Amino acid sequence: VNDITERALSLVAPDRTTLDALRDIDAGLRELPQVEVTIDHLIHGGMYGRTAHLPAGVVASGTVLRRATVLVLHGDVTMFTGTEAVRLTGFHVLPGLRGRKALFRTHAETHMTMILPSDAQSVEEAEADMTDETGLLARAPGNVTITKETS
């Protein structure tokens, strides 16, 4: 059966008050010792895939995203969705709306891949497509694959 259903959990843009609170949390997190988070990049077929590999016990904050995304998550993490905190264990594929900003706390090693449309030909171009806050992005070395395949 090909019924279309509306998924209960989406990653949404926070309201202005919540966004301001998240930015305050970001400022506090930057004062703490930092953990290196390995980031892998894939640019292929008009899409940018960005995978973060997070160890257990990490609190991480994302940037405000300029585009709608798909988030593929595997692990054990409490995540702020834009309106509430939810614990996700195992494997999940979640829709993310433009303007969202997430906050995560890992309970076990967690891998998160965000996929978004992008005509970028470099990681720098893809990151600029993704957010206006590129200076806040994790940049630990990981795999970079650029196929030159177009959509």
Model-derived segments and spans:
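Conserved short histidine dyad/triad with adjacent acidic residue
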Residues: 45-65
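Short acidic-glycine-tyrosine-enriched beta hairpin
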Residues: 78-102
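A short, N-terminal "cap"/entry segment at the start of jelly-roll beta-barrel domains
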Residues: 1-51, 133, 139-151
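Double-stranded beta-helix
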Residues: 107-151
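Glycine- and acidic-residue-biased ligand/ion/polar-headgroup-sensing regions
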Residues: 65-83
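Conserved hydrophobic/aromatic beta-strand scaffold that supports enzyme active sites
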Residues: 49-53, 70, 85, 93-95
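Tight coil/turn sites that cap or link beta-strands
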Residues: 55-57, 91, 97-99, 107-109
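Short glycine/proline-enriched turns and hinge-like loops at secondary-structure junctions
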Residues: 63-66, 105-108
